[in-house]
Amino acid sequence: MSNHGLQMPEGVHVEEVSDSEGQFVMGPLERGYGVTIGNALRRVLLSSLRGLAITAVKIDGVQHEFSTIPGVTEDVADLILNLKEVRFKADEMQEGHLHLNLEGPGNWTAADIDEATAEYDVLNPDQHVATLAEDAVVNVDLRVGYGRGYVPSEENKREDDPIGVIAIDSIFTPIKNVNYEVKPTRVGQKIDYEELLLDVETDGSLTPEEAITQGASILRDHVSFFIQLEEEPEPVVEEQEVDEEVKRIRELLAQPVDELDLSVRSHNCLKAANIKTIGDLVRREEDEMLKFRNFGRKSLQELVEVLDERGLQFGMDVEEYLEEKKAS
């Protein structure tokens, strides 16, 4: 690899590291590269890594966030602020729903949420949510979603949400803090070089090393398009990789649509249309889907996004995958 005559760093040294905090040192660097790399990594880490957060809450007897709950010290607005601080970890980034039955007296903490689910791990169980008096009885439903950065409540609203569901702002980013510092260093007798010190703190859902690796990969994947301007196109995917992709899609097509974890409205529409498997679904065209009763543009967009996440789309010719299955 050409270094274009520039002083290249010897590597990245890990100074301190724990499950949630780490310091990384890169050097030596040409003057100016510390800020260039440090600032780019910091912005990507804060904005582009995926995480889990509560996206909506429903409390029996509560119609809006300006309500109060009998026997609960905090009003709903304060309760929501506390729920925003609850941090989750899961083996897979997927949406889920939790139900809690709470009775006073006592404190409602994130530990109660942790006990209500086997799908997610709560990383800050001591997080206070609300104070319940002796006569307090609170039934709560929580929707947990995944995303990047900060998402306002308006974007978490769904047209098929029942009355009483309150969409909330979500802080998805798993990064709590990123700071960098550029210090002078020397190479031999030359002292006009730099080293970059990058401090990363996560919420514990991923390690600082994992966070740095993901952030650097995102940067690399974007910048690589400029590198490829004068390069030959990428070679065709090897036969074995193609076979693995065919196998993956074949298995997906055989799964029931229940595996897509759709909203109630979309699920009921598919059930009414007798669409039982993902294969049945992707055979359809988008225009055809809109003809089904109670199936609107928002439901269609939900399905388009869910299929896209799995490398699928409407109007697929699934016969080649079925033929593969017969041939095997």
UniProtKB/Swiss-Prot annotation:
List, alphabetically, the InterPro entries matched.
DNA-dir_RNA_pol_insert (IPR011262), DNA-dir_RNA_pol_RpoA/D/Rpb3 (IPR011263), DNA-dir_RpoA (IPR011773), RBP11-like (IPR036603), RNAP_asu_C (IPR011260), RNApol_insert_sf (IPR036643)
- MF terms in GO: DNA binding; DNA-directed RNA polymerase activity; protein dimerization activity
**Which UniProt keyword terms apply here?**
DNA-directed RNA polymerase, Nucleotidyltransferase, Transcription, Transferase
GO CC, one annotated term = DNA-directed RNA polymerase complex
* Region called Alpha C-terminal domain (alpha-CTD), residue ranges: 248-328
Q: Which GO annotations describe the biological process of this protein?
A: DNA-templated transcription
One protein family per Pfam: RNA_pol_A_bac
UniProt enzyme class = transferase
Recorded catalytic activity of this chain's protein:
RNA(n) + a ribonucleoside 5'-triphosphate = RNA(n+1) + diphosphate
According to its UniProt record, the EC number is: 2.7.7.6
Kindly indicate whether the keyword Nucleotidyltransferase belongs to this entry.
Answer: yes
Listed under subunit, the entry gives:
Homodimer. The RNAP catalytic core consists of 2 alpha, 1 beta, 1 beta' and 1 omega subunit. When a sigma factor is associated with the core the holoenzyme is formed, which can initiate transcription.
Quote the protein name from its UniProt record: DNA-directed RNA polymerase subunit alpha
What organism does this protein naturally occur in? Salinibacter ruber (strain DSM 13855 / M31)
